[in-house]
Structure formats: structure tokens, C-alpha cells
Amino acid sequence: MRKFISILIIVSTLLSYQICRAQSSPKYIEVEWQNGSEAAKRIMISKFYYDPLDSWSPFGNDVGSDTYYLYCDWKREHSNQNVKGFLEEELINFGYPGFDLYIDGNDPEKLKGIVDTMVNKYIDLNAINNIVISLAFSQLFLDGRIEREIKKWAEAAFSRELMYLDFWDSEKGEMEKRQKRMNQLLSDLRKG
């Protein structure tokens, strides 16, 4: 009987330990400088990266923040799959399957033609761009590197955003601030 009670105590202790450990284990790595990869700590040094209220941060706008957490979930479940599958899935969920992620601002008429077919025009394009840019910086933050194709897509996203920079000119100086931030993000992206 003593042996049975001892075994029962040991098993219940181990079980309690596993339950406590599982509850204290975070599902997501919070976007804070100290939690980033070594490369992210070197490259993503500006405070805006870690400000959840900064709408021009890759993780501060709603779409960018959602992309980070959705990518964390996807990565956990699809660790051996190409990240293009994640991005295609997000574009389908957003209502733009097959959007050409390589299209940039070098052909303004073609891009404007595509944007004109979108339900919410530039707002939808901006959301697509935010998904791509957030994914690139999510990879840098979590993995310490940005896949070559993701980097190309993000560079194209910045190029598309530059075409619509005047959208952000509602307040004096806002457009210039946005352009300065985009230049910094693009520079940091290229270091990743």
C-alpha cells in the first residue's frame, strides 16, 4: 500500500509539474527587443518596432500584428513547408487570391489599374502590403533572416506604398514622416 501511495504521489507530482509548465509556456514570443533573434537585435533597434500602437510599425498596425501571430501559428503547424503557402492563404482569406506580389511601382498605370478593381482601392492594397512587410520582419524577428523571395515581395510592397504616399498627406508633415519611416524600414529589410 505504501508503495502504491508513493507511486501515486510521484505520478501526481509529475503530472502537476507538466500542467504548470504547459500553462506557463507562452504560445507566442512577444514582440519585444530582448525576445528577438540576434539579427533582429542588431537590425531592429528603433523603438517603433516594439510599439504596439505605432501604426507605421510592421507589428503596430492591425494587419501587421495579426500577420505576426498568424505566422507564429502557421510556422508551428507547418515547419517544413514553404512560407509562400502561408502568404497565399492570407491573400485568399483577404479576398485577393493570386495577387501578383512582384508587381511594384515601376509600372504606375498597371498598378493603378489593379488597385481600381479592388473593393476598397488603396486601403486593400495597403493591407496586402502590410501583410507582406509584417511577414518579412516576423521572419527577421523570429528566425534571424528573411527568405529571399519574401524580401523581394516586401521590397515590391514598399515600392507600391511609395506610389500612394500622397494618401497620407491629410496632416501637415505626415507624408514626409511616412516616407522617412518607409526608407528606414526598407534599409533595415535589406540588412536582414
Model-derived features: positions:
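Eukaryote-biased recognition of C-terminal alpha-helical segments
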Residues: 158-192
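Charged, low-complexity interaction regions
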Residues: 80-81, 143-147
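Alpha-helical repeat scaffolds
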Residues: 150-159
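Acidic, Ser/Thr- and Gly/Pro-rich intrinsically disordered linkers and low-complexity segments
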Residues: 91-123
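N-terminal leader/targeting peptides and immediately adjacent processing regions
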Residues: 21-74
